């Protein structure tokens, strides 16, 4: 699912690069797998023939976001994003009180807070990703779901591609912001480059999208047992907004369901009638209550 870290087999890396044009000449790319650094599952685009992966280069290498697609046999393992505790040492000193407040808030509300973006990649690689303009990017998931492999399992669209891949939901291994910006897709042999589809251009009427999404999410096991989930999460989002207002950096991120569907926390906190829900393949408009009933 989106935001899952995967490691490509080192011996498969040359073939993977060869299938994606001349990207092996970019800084850090050729030795990425040999260094044990992971890639991240990104949103699928129409031209992907395999598991869609992203490789974010640091600012010193142009901050380019390289899109790859790996075959099942090229994947070695998968693991979760880092926790707030994992990234503490790499965080700027000015950020650390905010991280502590976030950790306390998450614990109090039984929310599993994972980190992606610049801070996570700096922790993962040791390369410098953070700048004075960096945000803190977080994923917010219910603790009950994150305690098992189900939270970090790949969504059904990727399941067949990972039939033989080991998954480590609690791995301490420690990401790139999965915003509406697309990952550029390197040119393939005999094909021209194209951009990944973000789904922001979806043209279906809002009501039709919301009804379709409601139907899909209503099939989530036990989704009808917590009709007041929006009310329950409101105090958490309000406290998160207070921490964000006091923080030296912007706190960005999503509430994430176990199937990889996610909604920006600011949209949910704003209390609008519809929110943009990112999925493995695009963006859907849904009612906040519909999303939150599945977020558990």
Which residues does each predicted region cover?
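Active-site nucleotide-donor binding segment shared across nucleotidyl transfer reactions
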Residues: 101-136, 140-151
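Helical scaffold of the NTase/Pol beta-like nucleotidyltransferase catalytic core
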Residues: 1-118, 237-249
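Intrinsically disordered, low-complexity terminal tails and inter-domain linkers enriched
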Residues: 144-238
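Catalytic cores of NTP-dependent nucleotidyl/adenyl transfer enzymes across multiple folds
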Residues: 63, 72-81, 88-89, 259-296
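Solvent-exposed residues in well-ordered beta-strands and their adjoining turns
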Residues: 56-58, 141-143, 256
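Conserved catalytic core of two-metal-ion nucleotidyltransferases
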Residues: 227, 231-277
């Amino acid at each position: 699912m989106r935001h899952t870290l995967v490691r490509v087999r080192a011996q498969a890396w040359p073939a993977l690069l060869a299938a994606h044009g001349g990207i092996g000449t970019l800084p850090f790319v050729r030795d990425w797998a040999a260094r044990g650094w992971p890639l991240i599952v990104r949103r699928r685009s129409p031209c992907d023939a395999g598991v869609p992966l992203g490789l974010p280069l640091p600012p010193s290498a142009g901050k380019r976001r390289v899109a790859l697609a790996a075959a099942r046999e090229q994947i070695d393992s998968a693991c979760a994003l880092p926790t707030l505790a994992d990234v503490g040492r790499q965080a700027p000193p000015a950020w650390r009180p905010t991280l502590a407040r976030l950790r306390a808030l998450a614990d109090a509300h039984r929310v599993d807070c994972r980190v992606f973006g610049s801070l996570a990649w700096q922790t993962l690689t040791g390369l410098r990703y953070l700048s004075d303009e960096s945000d803190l990017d977080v994923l917010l998931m219910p603790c009950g779901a994150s305690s098992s492999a189900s939270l970090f399992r790949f969504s059904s669209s990727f399941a067949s591609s990972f039939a033989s891949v080991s998954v480590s939901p609690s791995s301490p291994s420690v990401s790139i912001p999965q915003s509406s910006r697309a990952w550029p897709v390197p040119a393939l042999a005999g094909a021209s480059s194209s951009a990944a589809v973000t789904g922001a251009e979806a043209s279906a009427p809002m009501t039709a999208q919301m009804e379709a999404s409601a139907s899909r999410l209503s099939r989530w096991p036990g989704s009808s047992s917590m009709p007041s989930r929006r009310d329950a999460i409101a105090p958490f989002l309000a406290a998160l907004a207070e921490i964000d207002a006091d923080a030296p950096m912007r706190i960005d991120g999503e509430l994430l369901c176990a199937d990889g569907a996610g909604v920006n926390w600011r949209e949910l906190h704003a209390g609008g009638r519809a929110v943009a829900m990112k999925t493995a393949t695009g963006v859907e408009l849904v009612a906040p209550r519909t999303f939150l009933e599945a977020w558990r």
